[in-house]
Structures are given as C-alpha cells and as structure tokens.
Amino acid sequence: MSEEKQTAEQVEAAEQEEVTEQAEQAASQEQHEETAGQEEALQHQIDELQGLLDEKENKLLRVQADFENYKRRSRLEMEAAQKYRSQNVVTEILPALDNFERALQVEAESEQTKSLLQGMEMVRRQLMDALEKEGVEAIEAVGQEFDPNLHQAVMQVEDENFGSNIVIEELQKGYKLKDRVIRPSMVKVNQ
C-alpha cells in the first residue's frame, strides 16, 4: 500500500504541477495579452501625439513665414514712405513752378521788366534746384515716343515732319519723383 500511496501522491503531485503549469501559462498569456493591449494603446497615443506635434510644427512654420512676410512688407513700406516723403509737398509746389515758367515767357519791354524777370528766373532756378535735390526731375517729352506712363495726350495732329506716335509739343511739363511719376506731361501727339 505504501507503493500505491506513493504512486497516488505522485500522480496527485503531477496533476497539481500540471494544473499549476497551466495556471501559470494562462496567467502568462493573460499578462502577454494585457501587455500587448497596453503596447497598442501606447502606440496609438504616440501616433496621436506625433500627429499633434506635426500639426503644431506646420502651424509654427506658417506663423514664422507670415511674420517674415509682414516684416518684409513693413520694411518696403517704410522705404517707400522715406523715398517718397516729399511727394505731397512737390505736388503742391508744381502749380507755382508752372506759373513761374508762364511768367518768364512774357516779352520784356523795359529794363524794369527785364530785371523783374531775371529775379523771377533766379527764384525759379532755386526752386528747381531744391526740387532736384529731393529727386524731382522733369519728364522729357518733345521728340520722344508717346508713353502713356509718362505722357497724357490731350491733342492729336498729323504732321509729316514727325514720325507716328511722337510727341510734337508739350502743353504742360510732367515731373517724376525718383522713379514715380507725380504728374504726367500733357502733350500733343502726331498720329
């Protein structure tokens, strides 16, 4: 009986060992499945965070580009404002300059009138010098090809002495401030 008892105990121990082994395997499999689930959840979180990071980086790049464009635009506007700061004053002075030129076209009959015209010419010259220092220059018109950016045609005539589309007379001087036309020349153009 002692052998039978030992055998029964061995069988029971073997069965218990098998049950324990199966329980350990089940627990290990559950733990593995749980770990795999956690890994999957963590990978999903990583993917979401990476997507969010990419989105924020793109937004940052757009904001930086917008800011650079703003700085460039502001700089260009400041440069233009500095370059053309005197445009309003020049525009207001041009009619007075036109009047000087009209007055200087008068024929001087007496010494007093000649003296007055010389004084007016000196004032006109000083005024023109000051304007030129600011970058104002008269637009060349007579003999030039008509350019709608520089000239305003107020009359058209036919004259065989001039080519087609050539300015033959300037009725009012035009002026540029640096590279910007502030007043186009009023001209007579040959057809």
From Swiss-Prot:
PROSITE patterns: GRPE
Pfam families per record: GrpE
Major location category of this protein: cytoplasm
Subcellular location: Cytoplasm
Annotated segments matching region Disordered: 1-49
One function term, GO molecular function aspect: unfolded protein binding
A single cellular component GO annotation: cytoplasm
Record-level GO BP terms: protein folding
Biased composition (Acidic residues): 12-21
InterPro entries given in the database record: GrpE, GrpE_coiled_coil, GrpE_head
Keywords for this protein: Chaperone, Cytoplasm, Stress response
Basic and acidic residues compositional bias, start-end: 30-49
Complex and partners: Homodimer.
Family membership noted in the UniProt record: Belongs to the GrpE family.
HAMAP family associated with the record: GrpE (MF_01151)
Chain's role: Participates actively in the response to hyperosmotic and heat shock by preventing the aggregation of stress-denatured proteins, in association with DnaK and GrpE. It is the nucleotide exchange factor for DnaK and may function as a thermosensor. Unfolded proteins bind initially to DnaJ; upon interaction with the DnaJ-bound protein, DnaK hydrolyzes its bound ATP, resulting in the formation of a stable complex. GrpE releases ADP from DnaK; ATP binding to DnaK triggers the release of the substrate protein, thus completing the reaction cycle.
Name this polypeptide is given: Protein GrpE
Organism: Bacillus velezensis (strain DSM 23117 / BGSC 10A6 / LMG 26770 / FZB42) (Bacillus amyloliquefaciens subsp. plantarum)
Species classification: Bacteria, Bacillati, Bacillota, Bacilli, Bacillales
Gene of this entry: grpE
